[in-house]
């Protein structure tokens, strides 16, 4: 099944659904969840509670392990941290202590800030831990209070998502060969390695995983809810009038709006 939604000026103006989806069905947002967690950092930065120019270790001392003391909050938000495939599993992510212990053991693949590469899951575990640290509350609660509660929406990430019907993740089709992806993207240097196995995606069907609120891909939402969240972000003065542009790569000239 599938849903679609189109929003403008703060309202959903068109939506529909296909297959076995209904208007009430929630789908796993996967990486669209990242935007919720990153956007929650905006008011924390604006208030001074979180400083993007400070090292992550300023807020999470354990993170400094194995030479990561100079990784900045900004590096993590721009996916320049240098630890894209660092490990983090259910046994660690269940508690703050477990997350911090795992982060302490991570090692860098390159010098932070020197290149940009997609961090499939772990960068947003760092952001989630930062949110919890500077607010003293579970990051899932802060995401809801910042983004979804003002819209009158139920939480899209965290323990309460299991209260609504959620469409199970299904495996369909096969990954195209790297050569086909390169043809579409314009070169092999744009093709990311396939690092997320099918089992890692299907784990989102487990109630315990949904309750955990995986910040890099564990949100559950209807299409209209996602559209409304982005409408709210577009309306925030800090986003509409104070966006700073940073070229994240001198070679591909990709602009990151923050």
Provide a role label for each language-model segment.
Residues 1-22, 52, 91-92:
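A short, well-structured edge-of-sheet supersecondary motif
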Residues 6, 31, 120:
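Conserved strand-loop elements at the edges of beta-sheets that form or border functional pockets
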Residues 8, 56, 119:
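Short, solvent-exposed turn/loop segments enriched in Gly/Ser/Thr/Pro and often Arg
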Residues 10, 28-54, 127-132, 229:
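Active-site SXXK
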Residues 20-25, 60-63:
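Short helix/strand-bridging catalytic loops that position acidic/His residues to coordinate divalent metals
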Residues 51-66, 150:
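Short, glycine/proline-biased beta-turn/loop segments that scaffold the active-site neighborhood
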């Amino acid at each position: 099944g599938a849903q679609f939604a189109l929003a403008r000026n703060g309202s959903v103006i068109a939506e529909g659904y296909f297959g076995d989806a209904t208007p009430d069905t929630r789908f796993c947002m996967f990486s669209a969840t990242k935007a919720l967690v990153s956007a929650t950092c905006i008011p924390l930065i604006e208030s001074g509670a979180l400083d993007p120019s400070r090292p992550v270790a300023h807020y999470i001392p354990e993170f400094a392990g194995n030479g990561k003391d100079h990784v900045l909050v900004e590096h993590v938000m721009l996916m320049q941290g240098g630890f894209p495939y660092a490990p983090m599993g259910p046994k660690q992510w269940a508690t703050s202590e477990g997350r911090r212990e795992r982060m302490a053991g991570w090692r860098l693949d390159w010098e932070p800030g020197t290149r940009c590469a997609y961090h499939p899951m772990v960068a947003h575990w760092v952001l989630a831990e930062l949110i919890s640290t500077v607010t003293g509350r579970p990051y899932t609660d802060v995401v809801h209070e910042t983004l979804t509660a003002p819209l009158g929406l139920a939480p899209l990430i965290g323990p309460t998502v299991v209260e609504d019907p959620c469409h199970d993740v299904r495996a369909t089709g096969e990954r195209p060969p790297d050569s086909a992806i390169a043809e579409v993207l314009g070169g092999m240097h744009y093709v990311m390695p396939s690092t997320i196995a099918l089992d890692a995606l299907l784990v989102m069907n487990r109630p315990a995983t949904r309750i955990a609120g995986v910040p890099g891909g564990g949100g559950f939402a209807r299409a209209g809810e996602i559209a409304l969240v982005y409408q709210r972000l577009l309306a925030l003065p800090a986003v509409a009038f104070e966006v700073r542009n940073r070229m994240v790569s001198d070679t591909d000239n990709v602009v990151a709006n923050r």
